[in-house]
């Protein structure tokens, strides 16, 4: 399904991210539940951590609070802004997704220690099992969304 298309289309275009990647991310993160809150306290459709969301909101001049972080418009804007910054940093979809899930700090360590390649050619070597599965699931769903 491609829910919230008005926001996905708007922010995909604004931040230069492929719409289908955003749909695949939302599906993996919250299964399109705007009120989703994880055990780690990540929030909304794109499961943003409060601190990450706060930093992104400042850059976009958004006044963020506990309510509007769950607003699909705000959440998709910040989540898309975040994945765009990771795609820009790593220049590789798989590696950017790993960073979205496990954090840039971990991904930078994995690359510098040779655990994974910066070009994403060996994502099956991602040391965190959850992140490993996460990246492969999103890449699979991303391909499916491209066919729809």
Give the positions of each predicted feature.
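Catalytic glycan-binding domains that act on GlcNAc-containing polysaccharides
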Residues: 1-148
């Amino acid at each position: 399904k491609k829910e919230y298309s008005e926001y996905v289309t708007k922010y995909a275009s604004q931040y230069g991210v492929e719409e289908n990647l955003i749909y695949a991310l939302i599906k993996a993160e919250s299964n399109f539940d705007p009120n989703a809150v994880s055990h780690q306290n990540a929030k909304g459709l794109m499961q943003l951590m409060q601190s990450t969301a706060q930093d992104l909101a400042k850059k976009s001049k958004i006044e963020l609070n506990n309510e509007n972080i769950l607003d699909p418009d705000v959440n998709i804007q910040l989540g898309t802004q975040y994945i765009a910054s990771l795609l820009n940093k790593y220049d590789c979809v798989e590696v950017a997704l790993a960073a979205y899930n496990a954090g840039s700090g971990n991904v930078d360590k994995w690359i510098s220690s040779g655990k994974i390649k910066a070009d994403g050619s060996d994502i099956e070597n991602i040391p965190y099992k959850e992140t490993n599965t996460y990246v492969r699931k999103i890449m699979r769903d991303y391909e499916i969304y491209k066919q729809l």
